[in-house]
């Protein structure tokens, strides 16, 4: 797990609190993804991601309230310097113990803490393609996709947002699930560019579609893994050819089998593991979804 030391002294010097500040968040990260990350270090009571009220864009930082001091201490220990995408997160105790009462002055303080790092990073605006800085913003999504139904709040008592998705899908009759897959397939064929944009803005829809395909017996796990792996494989095929020629295939197969076993651990099994192991498994799952390990 890649890490980088260092966090703003103004944050680090705050006394221990159940509320922590998490900064230097890539702008394409949604509240659900940050909640998923934070839930791996301890039970989350509340999460508030900050958005610019004028543009709806993420400010690149959030406040997270954990259930107890032990969990918030674990977050500071494990998330400060943690690499998320191309950024290294900043995590420290917040000066405000009430996540809903962050004043304008305090927001400006955290804007200053977070600003230099994000302004100098790789989060520059790009007028071409989807506006990732608006990802997860309800107003932006409703304008781009007016027929998209409003979502529901994530139940923070669930272990992960993935469990929330499974719970909601289980409430739908099989006929409704199959109808969704049929309609979504028809729409993506008619509007391929919009479909790509929607899935980039709402990555949870990819999980919904994959789960429906699996639970309805339309696909198997082995059918879906190559689809997630293909873009990464195509991008790095040239570089990997020379490496694969000198690596023992038996060793590669053994590594892939071990990785597959780890990725098949359920949330209950993961929840009893130590903090560092939970974070490592979460990291592996994110890399697998991005196709960094290729097909297996």
Curated annotation (Swiss-Prot):
CDD domains linked to this entry: RRM_CSTF2_RNA15_like
Protein name according to UniProt: mRNA 3'-end-processing protein RNA15
Region named Disordered: 99-140
Coiled coil stretches, renumbered: none
Residue span, RRM domain: 18-96
Gene name for this UniProt entry: RNA15
Composition-biased stretches (Low complexity): 100-135
Species for this entry: Saccharomyces cerevisiae (strain ATCC 204508 / S288c)
Pfam families per UniProt: CSTF_C, RRM_1
One GO CC term, this protein: mRNA cleavage factor complex
Chief localization: nucleus
Spans through the membrane: none
UniProt keyword terms in alphabetical order: mRNA processing, Nucleus, RNA-binding
Miscellaneous field: Present with 6350 molecules/cell in log phase SD medium.
Subunit structure: Component of the CFIA complex, which is composed of RNA14, RNA15, PCF11 and CLP1. Interacts directly with RNA14. Interacts with polyadenylate-binding protein PAB1.
Location in or out of the cell: Nucleus
Example of a GO MF term: mRNA binding
Record GO biological process: mRNA 3'-end processing; mRNA processing
Protein's job: RNA-binding component of the cleavage factor IA (CFIA) complex, which is involved in the endonucleolytic cleavage during polyadenylation-dependent pre-mRNA 3'-end formation and cooperates with the cleavage factor NAB4/CFIB and the cleavage and polyadenylation factor (CPF) complex. Binds to A-rich RNA sequence elements.
């Amino acid at each position: 797990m890649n890490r980088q030391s260092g966090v703003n002294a103004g944050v680090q010097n705050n006394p221990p609190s159940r509320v922590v500040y998490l900064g230097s968040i890539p702008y394409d990260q949604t509240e659900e993804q940050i909640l998923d990350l934070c839930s791996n270090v301890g039970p989350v009571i509340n999460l508030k991601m900050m958005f610019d009220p004028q543009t709806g864009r993420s400010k690149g930082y959030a406040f997270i309230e954990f259930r107890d001091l032990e969990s918030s201490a674990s977050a500071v220990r494990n998330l400060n310097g943690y690499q998320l995408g191309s950024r290294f997160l900043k995590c420290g105790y917040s000066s405000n113990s009430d996540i809903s009462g962050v004043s304008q002055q305090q927001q400006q303080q955290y804007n200053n803490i977070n600003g230099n790092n994000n302004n100098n990073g790789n989060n520059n605006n790009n007028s071409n393609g989807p506006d990732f800085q608006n990802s997860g913003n309800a107003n932006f999504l409703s304008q781009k996709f007016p027929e998209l139904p409003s979502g529901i709040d994530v139940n923070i008592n669930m272990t992960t947002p993935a469990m929330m998705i499974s719970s909601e899908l289980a409430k739908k009759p099989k006929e409704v699930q199959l109808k969704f897959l049929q309609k979504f397939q028809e729409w993506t064929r008619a509007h391929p560019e919009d479909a790509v944009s929607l899935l980039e803005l709402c990555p949870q829809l990819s999980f919904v579609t994959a789960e429906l395909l699996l639970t309805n017996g339309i696909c198997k796990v082995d059918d879906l893994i190559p689809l997630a792996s293909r873009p990464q494989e195509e991008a790095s095929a040239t570089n990997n050819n020379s490496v694969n020629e000198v690596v023992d295939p038996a060793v590669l197969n053994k590594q892939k089998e071990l990785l597959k076993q780890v990725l098949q651990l359920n949330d209950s099994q993961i929840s009893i593991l130590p903090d560092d192991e939970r974070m490592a498994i979460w990291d592996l799952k994110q890399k697998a979804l991005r196709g960094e390990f290729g097909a297996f």
